[in-house]
Amino acid sequence: ICGDPLATSLSHPLAEAVTGQPGALVNPALVLHVSIGQSTVATRQVIANLFYRGVALHRPVRHGETLRSTVTIQGLRELSRREDRPARGLALLGIHTTCVNPNGSDGPTVADYERCAMLRFRDPEATTGHNDDLGAADPEVDLEAWHGLAPTWDAAPLRPPRPVDPPSGQRRTDPLRDTVTNAPELARLTQNLAGVHRDRALGPGGRRLVYGGHTIGLAQASLCRMLPDTGTVLGWQSCDHPAPVFEEDVLTFHHTVLDERPSGSGRLRAVRVEVDAERSDGSTDAVLDWRLVTWGA
């Protein structure tokens, strides 16, 4: 659905040459789609997901492995009431995803992160008094803090014939825009239970809301087109959704390499990806501001 050309997930021989292990790697975006989908057991009545932060991918996932996620409520905040909308509040969730061992027990950690969901009240007349400080994501990426997640793989097979070395701080726009399609299909495939992604009656203006990870998946696909020497994604420093995305929106992707550091035979990159959506009426909105860390050649 997202068309991600990440080479280590598309090619068995290349994945084996890079990792030194047999078998193909599951795309890290798909790993997080599944994890996020599992976490929606806590947010079926979501209005929107506002942000992700501190996303850390601790190990790669290979085909055939089973994932399990646990969700912890880390904070709740009731929002101010307005006559033109139902009662709502914010829930800060901590998600921990593991691989399942053959005996059914939790195995090694795959991912840890937080996400903030805006939810409808079960009882619109209720007053909860919740007013937790949910904090804010730090957008500044310190690559030194990410070295512990970097793999000890061989980056040489990822190096293209012509080096890919975009100058740090230069904003580059992907010439290939992309149209958002198959949104409910991705939600179903990843067991995302949020009704707003499946039922247009629950969305703003009677339109289905595109799952935020769908936009992120298309943004990662664009990143891998622009930086084809990318081997994997190690995590997301921050990820904000400033406006909703709808099916048939046409997305434009802007990429800025913020920093890079050597790591083993490869390098770490801190990248900012900004996405704009062109609507059916011709208007344009910023819909994603994403700061992530990659490892590659």
Predicted regions and their residues:
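C-terminal structured interaction module
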Residues: 222, 238-240, 244, 250, ...
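Short, structured motif recognition centered on aromatic/hydrophobic residues
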Residues: 35, 52, 67-73, 91-97, ...
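Well-ordered mid-protein domain cores that form the structural environment of catalytic cofactors
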Residues: 46, 55, 61, 68-70
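HotDog/MaoC-like acyl-thioester-processing domains
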Residues: 63-152, 247, 254-297
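Generic structural detector for well-ordered beta-strands
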Residues: 56, 116-118, 174-179, 240, ...
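Hot-dog-fold acyl-thioester-processing enzymes
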Residues: 1-52, 111, 121-234, 297
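Short alpha-helix capping/helix-loop boundary micro-motifs
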Residues: 52-57, 236-242
